[in-house]
């Protein structure tokens, strides 16, 4: 039973030396209004260390969880989530995804930015803590 308690305590959570941010702004995470999300999604991502030094993002993966209202077989409404994934080289979303977010994103949708690679001060690629944004 002791093994399970340490599993759920979060002690084994990986520590990252860098954290990724939208538009290099530390306040743009968690819940964002659609208006704010649409305005910052066009800007590059950046990463920062614990000393707030900025580093260049080399690549990242994105998962977009788009919630929609559908009808089940008996005509009752149900909320269903469609998942889209993309990989990006560099520090920006593609123009197609920026346009898609602006046209399709809605309250309750979630964007996950994961598997972020950062160019560190040693000119080597490092893993970076990802980001989760929920549109409200």
Protein language model regions, located:
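Bacterial Sec-dependent N-terminal signal peptides
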Residues: 1-15
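Beta-strand/loop-dominated core regions that host nucleotide or nucleotide-derived cofactor-binding catalytic loops
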Residues: 12-136
């Amino acid at each position: 039973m002791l093994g399970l308690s340490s599993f759920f305590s979060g002690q084994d959570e990986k520590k990252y030396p860098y954290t990724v941010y939208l538009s290099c702004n530390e306040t743009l995470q968690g819940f964002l209004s659609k208006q704010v999300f649409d305005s910052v999604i066009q800007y590059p991502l950046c990463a920062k260390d614990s000393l707030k030094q900025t580093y260049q993002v080399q690549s990242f993966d994105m998962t977009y969880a788009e919630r929609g209202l559908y009808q089940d077989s008996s005509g009752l409404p149900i909320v269903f989530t469609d998942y889209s994934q993309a990989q990006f080289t560099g520090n920006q979303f593609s123009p197609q995804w920026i346009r898609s977010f602006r046209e399709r994103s809605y309250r309750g949708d979630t964007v996950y930015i994961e598997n972020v690679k950062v160019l560190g001060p040693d000119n080597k690629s490092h893993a970076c803590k990802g980001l989760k944004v929920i549109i409200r």
